[in-house]
From Swiss-Prot:
The keyword Transcription regulation applies. Residues 133-200 form the COMM domain. It comes from the Eukaryota. Scaffold protein in the commander complex that is essential for endosomal recycling of transmembrane cargos; the commander complex is composed of the CCC subcomplex and the retriever subcomplex. May modulate activity of cullin-RING E3 ubiquitin ligase (CRL) complexes. Associates with the NF-kappa-B complex and suppresses its transcriptional activity. It comes from Bos taurus. One of its GO terms (cellular component) is cytoplasmic vesicle. InterPro entries: COMM (IPR017920), COMMD4/6/7/8 (IPR047155), COMMD7 (IPR037358). CDD domains: Commd7. Keywords: Cytoplasmic vesicle, Transcription, Transcription regulation, Ubl conjugation pathway. This is COMM domain-containing protein 7. Pfam families: COMM_domain (PF07258), COMM_HN (PF21672). It is found in: Cytoplasmic vesicle. The gene is COMMD7.
Amino acid sequence: MGRLHCTQDPVPEAVGGDMQQLNQLSAQQFSALTEVLFHFLTEPKEVERFLAQLSEFAATNQISLGPLRSIVKSLLLVPNGALKKGLTAEQVRADFMTLGLSEEKAIYFSEKWKQNAPTLARWAVGQTLMINQLVDMEWKFGVTSGSSELEKVGSIFLQLKLVVKKGNQTENVYIELTLPQFYSFLHEMERVRTSMECFS
């Protein structure tokens, strides 16, 4: 098996067999299953609805739910890695073909990926921001009054106190910056804000 873009980890042995099972689905069945998957990828909190849709798909297409869950788990391997690494539709298609999915189905999935990319990217950014959410920020200016380096005496510095939410608790993070570092930091924050406004 060739190298994958979505992960460096070894791929579970079941994946190859699951891709062969997917290849046996008709175009209509694969399209319906892909639809269910993208509903889940764009609204990952709706787990119960996702499982209900899988059960319905299994019943409609006379497929056992156990094997179907394994197939879906293998199918999610690429999009989950692609979200973390920001892969293109072309890389998603290549990874599916490397795993053994037929070219026709890999192209279909990558086209769906391209259509849903903005929504998925927005969700991924939201998840990243929720991991370390900035709750509060305080700053103080100071002037260096004594230093072993003569040129540093009288230079202005800035102390930042960031209150970051990690899970259910908050943590204080302290940073000391020189004035040029602070302006550079401010510039980066402006760029982040502009990027975030593009997504909202």
